[in-house]
Every structure is written in C-alpha cells, then in structure tokens.
C-alpha cells in the first residue's frame, strides 16, 4: 500500500466508446491496483454483450431487491454502472482496493477539460470481436430508469 501512495503517475484517460464493459473493467482494475489514476470518458457508449431483453429482465429483478429507505442502492446512471463494474473487480473491502477505487473517475461524454487530452483505448476489449448481439450501457441505463437530465 505504501508503494501506491508514494508513486505519482500521470492521469490516464480511457475512451470507453465501443469497448466491452467487463473486459474493459478488468483491465482498468488491474491498472488501478498498480497506482495509476484513470479517467473513463464516454461511459454511456461502452457495450454489454448478450441479448438485451435478457439483461434488462435480470437487472429489473435485481433492482426490485431493497428500496429507498434501506439498501442496497443500485446504480442507474451509465457512469455509476461502469464505476460499480470496476469496483466489483477490485478487492474493495481491503485498504488497497479502496485506495485504488478512489483513483477512478468516470464521466458521461467527454468533459471540456479533457477534450484536448490524448485518449487511450483497451485493445483486448473492442466490441468488433463480438459475434453475438450487444447493446450500449446508455441503452441499458435508460431501460432500468435513468433519466438523461439527472
């Protein structure tokens, strides 16, 4: 853990447009554990593989658990869905996982201050490789109740 705090690595900007969510999240989680600070942009354009109807049904059943007064609270915004997916691939209940999670920022679209920055992509997570159906995180979020004005 001391290694992560003493190192100051530059901020890496990752463009999630057209990347498979789970594969991207696992690669980013690994890099976060090495101490890198990562910013993910275009979170709503990442893709989820599988049949849209099945994934939406599973998500709505999962969302039925809990409520407003008591947890668990479920993410509906695309940036929250992506952030939570990365969190699931970190050892979040340990100090190194919490510290790594703090080094992650996720945005819908591209913020003005990051537009001129060089953006990376994850080569192993390209959606072009998929032979099955897929849909975007933005479509998924709209189906489970995200209002784009939020």
Would you name each region that the model predicts?
Residues 1-150:
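Ribosome-associated RNA-binding proteins
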